[in-house]
Design a protein with these regions (language model features):
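Short, solvent-exposed S/T- and G/P-enriched segments that are highly enriched in secreted/extracellular
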Residues: 418-438, 464-468, 505-518, 549-554, ...
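Surface-exposed interfaces of beta-sheet-rich extracellular modules
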Residues: 436-464, 521-549, 582, 606-619
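Short coil/turn motif common to extracellular beta-sandwich-like domains
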Residues: 399-403, 433-438, 484-487, 518-522, ...
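Middle-to-C-terminal accessory/interaction subdomains
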Residues: 1-15, 20-21, 30, 35-39, ...
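Conserved "repeat-terminator" motif of extracellular CCP/Sushi domains
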Residues: 400, 463-492, 548-578, 603, ...
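Conserved ATP-binding subdomain of kinase catalytic cores across diverse folds
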Residues: 2, 10-180
Length: 619
């Protein structure tokens, strides 16, 4: 709920910056927090609609509150916000956008999907809400997290300006029609430090072929290649029609103690997507069958070098393979048809109960909105069905697509490509992959033994190393064999002494301790005894202790899982005394003179002890 003398003036289209109050309620109408601050316009094309978005900046100078204190976004841990964005779906607004074609979800959906997919970009977190203006219902909105903000950058990445307007520690560039510096201006004069540094990087890539790995490594030290890949993949997948020359932001942190010190991308408005809106960028096609490689044809849209950099990086084999593998990692997971539709349906389910009141307030029909959502849903299904064949058609380096099945034999885990973990619990695991690129596998846990490749094609590889790289020629079954293991638990009886156990040269001092061994491995054990205790025996249920269980130094084969217990007993103690005690007499015990009494000595059981008296001359 927002209120203020002139806030309605702003939302009715007057570009003023009025003061006002914001109250934030939960779904049950319970007030969570409130404060006073400044409102300002949010949106460009969408500002022409009757239902408008706005930014809110809470100011502690008003004496009420310094930040909206609540965990607004389920995907984030942050719980204090001085600045927030409140949007009415922008250019996907229903009923106002593009002749009533909006679904009232696109922008929030793409940002949310990117977050759930853990793409290497920054997103505006989203939380659907309804808005009241001075007590009057104002419709379905989204609370959005502001990312081009030092509070955001400081909280998540420990990157911030040293002082306002400084060029140190933060460089942030934005393009919307033109390009400007958000952070990193530096001293007055032509250009900015951030722009100059970016231009230098663009020039370096243009002048130094990235097919040369040395040049590529140099570029990679300054530029987050994963962010570039994810940014181009996502915009190409959703067929964004106003990126590069609009809605493009990129930045890097300069604080050496912070994170994200390479240039990386931020998502901005993602509402002109999925064949919706005006084609401001001039992409070749906005249909579901648009080629995934279309971004490479866009010249230098926006004039900041993003596409020339992209095309140059694609000449590097490592980058190209990372790009294709990344697509398939995503296509088989968070950007799959199933997952994308699940997220869309779940987000629509949140706003659907409020859409009748939104429509009653602003116009349109419920059926019209439902049809728009159905069109969006069908477009997404058609798009994800076309992408793999589209890659094969437009990227001559790749072949396929082929089925890859990974099977784990034994107990262990394999990582395929990036973060696809296959273990003995989810094996066999089947995926679809392209040929013509390096597809990496690595055994990441368990006692790896060897690989086996079952295929109609021939592959040359070392079966005994824990990494494997395949250029697929057809369908393939990859078997990863792990040596069977047995768990041995070590214990001591009784507990509470200083005794430890030496196991293959490693001292175990915490009991019980369990160690996994390959089946039939020979294990050597011996006790390190507390001085007050002596060895009694070893106990086991199934493994055979050699030479016997009564030998302090022993070994066994890990043929079965078992508990091996070291039994110890307290040594007998002998106390020596002289009566009467006030003499110079002493006692010789095994050649050692004792002259302090009483003295207690512990001995192994049944040890022979020799004693003799050294008498005071008067006794």
């Amino acid at each position: 709920s927002i209120s203020g003398d002139q806030v309605d003036n702003l939302l009715n289209g007057n570009q003023i910056e009025p003061d006002g109050t914001l109250e934030w309620f939960d779904t049950n109408g319970v007030l969570l927090d409130k404060g006073t601050g400044e409102y300002n316009k949010h949106g460009n094309d969408s500002w022409a609609y009757a239902q408008r978005g706005f930014d809110f900046v809470m100011r502690d100078q008003f004496g009420y509150n310094y930040a909206l204190k609540d965990k607004i976004f389920d995907t984030k841990s942050r719980d204090k916000f001085q600045r927030i964005i409140v949007k009415a779906a922008a250019n996907d607004n229903y009923p106002f956008s593009y002749g009533g074609s909006g679904a009232h979800i696109r922008d929030a959906y793409v940002h949310h999907l990117s977050q759930l997919a853990d793409l290497r970009v920054d997103e505006r977190s989203t939380s659907s809400c309804i808005l009241y203006l001075n007590g009057e219902y104002w419709g379905v909105y989204e609370m959005r997290e502001k990312v081009d903000d030092t509070d955001f950058l400081s909280y998540y990445y420990d990157q911030d300006e040293i002082y306002r307007e400084s060029a140190d520690y933060l460089q942030y560039l934005k393009t919307w029609g033109g390009t400007w510096t958000k952070y990193g201006d530096g001293m007055p004069g032509p250009g900015s430090i951030a722009r100059n540094d970016w231009d230098d990087f663009v020039d370096f890539v243009a002048a130094n072929p990235m097919v040369n790995q040395v040049n590529y490594n140099q570029a990679k030290s300054q530029y987050n290649m994963g962010s570039l890949i994810d940014y181009f993949l996502l915009n190409s997948y959703v067929v964004c029609q106003d990126w590069l020359n609009y809605n493009t932001a990129w930045w890097r942190g300069m604080d050496p103690n912070g994170e994200k010190k390479k240039w990386r991308y931020t998502l901005w408005d993602m509402d002109n997507t999925f064949d919706h809106g005006t084609n401001y960028t001039g992409i070749p096609s906005s249909s579901p069958t648009a080629e995934p490689c279309d971004a490479s044809t866009l010249g230098n849209s926006g004039g900041q070098g993003h596409v020339p950099i992209w095309n140059e990086m694609l000449t590097n084999q490592e980058f190209h393979d990372d790009y294709i593998n990344r697509w398939q990692d995503l296509a088989n997971g968070p950007l799959s048809c199933t997952f994308m539709i699940h997220i869309l349906d779940s987000m629509i389910a949140v706003i659907e109960p409020e859409m009748p009141r939104q429509i009653a307030t602003w116009g349109g029909t419920y059926t019209g909105w439902e049809n728009n959502v159905t069109n969006l849903r069908n477009w997404i299904l058609a798009r994800c069905d076309s992408m793999n064949s589209g890659f094969v058609d437009c990227d001559t380096a790749i072949t396929g697509i082929f089925d890859v099945t990974v099977q784990i034999i034994g107990i262990g885990a394999v990582e395929m490509s990036n973060s696809n973990i296959i273990n003995n619990l989810n094996s066999p695991w089947t995926d679809q992959r392209f040929g013509g690129i390096d597809l990496p596998f690595e055994a990441v846990s368990g006692p790896f033994d060897h690989w086996e490749i079952i295929s109609a094609n021939t592959y040359v590889f070392d079966p005994n190393v824990d990494t494997l790289v395949l250029d697929l020629q057809g369908d393939v079954l990859v078997k990863a064999y792990f040596t069977p293991t047995r768990d041995i638990t070590y214990n001591i009886s009784p507990i509470g002494t200083a005794t430890t156990i030496n196991v293959d040269g490693v001292v175990i001092s915490v009991f019980p301790t369990t160690i996994s061994y390959p089946i039939n491995q020979i294990v050597n054990i011996s006790p390190n005894l507390d001085p007050l205790y002596e060895f009694s025996s070893w106990d086991s249920d199934s493994v055979i202790l050699l030479p016997t269980s009564n030998s302090p130094v022993a070994s066994f084969s890990s043929s079965n899982s078992d508990t091996v217990t070291l039994n110890i007993v307290k040594k007998p103690t002998i106390t020596y005394m002289i009566d009467p005690g006030s003499t110079t007499s002493s006692i010789n015990v095994d050649g050692v003179v004792i002259n302090t009494f009483p003295t207690t000595i512990s001995y192994p059981t049944n040890q022979i002890v020799n004693i003799s008296a050294n008498l005071d001359p008067l006794y």
